[in-house]
């Protein structure tokens, strides 16, 4: 049976859906020794992204019989029809629009996995996303959480890949998280947080942590329906944690042709014709975004001012150092002249004696210094 088409609610365009079977045929019990994994995805009016998200899930190389996919949907354009055919999916829909922190806590309560791994609905995740995270946590038994403090972000408007991070050994953005169930006995998200929720969950980045390979974890494509316009991150670039990376291109991480087509060519027109995804409908989220933006702007302005003052001090110090250097050079020259003059004075006195010149007519140091 060929792929079916489904209308995109709100824009009248059609979108092909991935209807293949998400079951890996294996002998019963063959993979029981592997940790059971709960994939968690919160979503709000992101219908255009779900074909891509499903393909990412389908391409994971971790055994599907050791996975479940928890989806919490509080959007007005529910995606139940797009995911209900997937055996691993546990879909939960809510009419109440929630903050991201509350949605993540709610997802956790629905999971049964030994390891919980995040898959955001609008980012690309490589096939080894799950297996790499599981292997890394297994190899680091003291770590409760894994993630990547380095994230690659491709900005189409300037055709440039940027490397963000690293920010610290215990830091990562939530979209890269993978953690043991044990962690949920120690922490939870702030229900009222919609942005920057990671800091609370990781207790100020003090949770025992291990870093993941960013190339095996996530690739981010900014788009017009982001709650925060990621292009604004470039205002103060380059800086120590935000730099272009000419050695990494999209194909280095993303090798699925149809997903590449979606992100590189199709996405802009699709989102322009999908009004439900407009960030203006996230009223409470936007309030928090505005507060964070203001704080970030103030912080970056203080950083800029500090750098400017440091540069001015450096310039002043250089001027003083150069002046001191010139003074020392001139002093050295003067001393050398004085030494030479004294030598000449001694010679002159010797000649004076030979010539019988009277002392009152002789040269003195005052004549030559």
Label every model-predicted segment:
Residues 167-260:
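Conserved nucleotide-sugar donor-binding catalytic segment
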Residues 128-161:
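Conserved donor NDP-sugar-binding/catalytic core segment of glycosyltransferases
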Residues 54-93:
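Acidic donor-binding segment of Leloir-type glycosyltransferases
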Residues 94-111:
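Glycine-rich, basic loop-to-helix element that forms the pyrophosphate-binding segment
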Residues 1-58, 330:
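N-proximal low-complexity "stem/linker" segments adjacent to membrane-targeting elements
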Residues 35-38, 68, 200:
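Cell-envelope/extracellular polymer assembly enzymes that use nucleotide-activated donors
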Residues 120-125:
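The conserved acidic donor/metal-binding loop of glycosyltransferases
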